[in-house]
């Protein structure tokens, strides 16, 4: 989220990050699969307040990366961000390791919903079929999408230059992707 903090998106590990703020539960607990399943309404209260940032606009860094892609100097972006600001800035080849707040799906019928549906619903967002809608983001206790991870490995292997920014490099497996750069 470091690239997005300029856009008003909270990060996790900085002094002002979510991990240093007081909540009823630690953020890493709230953003876990088991918490989502057991305390779904509390999950969505936190998610709406802290993870959905409807007014966020791409930062200068997002725009520079998009301009580099447009100029043919950047072949892709591998990001842990879930905010979609790279795409909003114009980047097209974005691999979102942790998913996106812009995709939400029904756990029962797999129908997709925009983030506004989550934001504007009260309590636990439900599909017309009655199923709970889950953000398409990777929660703690969940694995990364293997197809996205494989795409990231391939993009890094093919790169002749690797720009790393806005990360503490402590979240695995994302932090381990550096080893694929030669």
Features from the language model and the residues they span:
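Conserved catalytic core of sirtuin-type NAD+-dependent deacylases
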Residues: 1-182
């Amino acid at each position: 989220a470091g690239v997005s903090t300029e856009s008003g998106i909270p990060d996790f590990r900085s002094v002002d990050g979510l991990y240093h703020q007081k909540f009823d539960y630690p953020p890493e607990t709230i953003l876990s699969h088991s918490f989502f399943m057991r305390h779904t309404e509390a999950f969505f209260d936190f998610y709406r307040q802290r993870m959905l940032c409807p007014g966020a606009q791409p930062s200068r860094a997002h725009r520079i990366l998009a301009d580099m892609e447009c100029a043919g100097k950047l072949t892709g972006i591998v990001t842990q961000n879930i905010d979609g600001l790279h795409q909003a800035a114009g980047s097209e080849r974005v691999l979102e390791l942790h998913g996106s707040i812009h995709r939400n799906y029904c756990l029962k019928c797999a129908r997709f919903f925009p983030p506004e549906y989550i934001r504007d619903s009260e309590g636990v967002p439900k599909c017309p079929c009655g199923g709970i809608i889950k953000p398409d983001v990777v929660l703690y206790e969940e694995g990364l999408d293997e197809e996205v991870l494989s795409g990231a490995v391939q993009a890094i292997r093919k790169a002749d230059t690797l720009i790393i920014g806005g990360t503490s490099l402590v979240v695995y497996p994302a932090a381990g992707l550096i080893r694929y750069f030669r």
